[in-house]
A protein has these predicted regions:
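Two-component/phosphorelay signaling modules centered on CheY-like receiver
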Residues: 7-40
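Alpha4-beta5-alpha5 "output face"
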Residues: 74, 93-97
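The C-terminal output helix
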Residues: 118-129
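A short, hydrophobic beta-strand element within the central beta-sheet of small alpha/beta folds
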Residues: 57-61, 79-89
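C-terminal output helix
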Residues: 108-117
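Conserved phosphotransfer microenvironments
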Residues: 20, 42-46, 53-76
Length: 129
């Protein structure tokens, strides 16, 4: 891996903590996570995207809030890879329209993080099982 990874997570505190545990459990990724931050407020998200350069965004918010998060993030940083984990499969088509790198139904698992990372080879992240 060529770079450190700055991960921005958006969702509830328990879901973000669980996702961080999954990320930290992936040896090929955790050694390169330099910093992670998690948010649950859309206005704060917009401010963070102005001041900080995340490598990727994990969206864990349910329903329309998750879609709004993706929309705002893509508006600010169109090339930011977004992994969107939702409680509703119906948002899959929206994730495609918003150019998300990956969409899956919750929960966040090592397997679906692995699938998501495979779609982001340009990040230089490799996952070894």
């Amino acid at each position: 891996m060529d770079q450190n990874v700055n991960v921005l997570l958006f969702g509830s505190d328990p879901e973000c903590r669980a996702a961080i545990d999954v990320l930290n459990g992936l040896d090929a990724l955790s050694a390169h996570i330099r910093q992670h931050r998690h948010l649950s407020d859309l206005e704060e998200l917009e401010m963070v995207l102005v001041d900080w350069s995340p490598t990727l965004l994990l969206v864990l918010a349910d329903g329309a809030e998750g879609m709004e998060c993706v929309y705002r993030a893509k508006e600010r940083r169109p090339s930011l890879p977004v992994f969107w984990f939702s409680d509703d499969r119906q948002f899959g088509m929206q994730s495609y329209r918003l150019n998300c790198a990956y969409f899956s139904i919750k929960p966040v698992t090592p397997e679906n993080i692995h699938k998501a990372l495979q779609r982001c080879d340009h990040m230089g992240i490799r996952y070894a099982k």
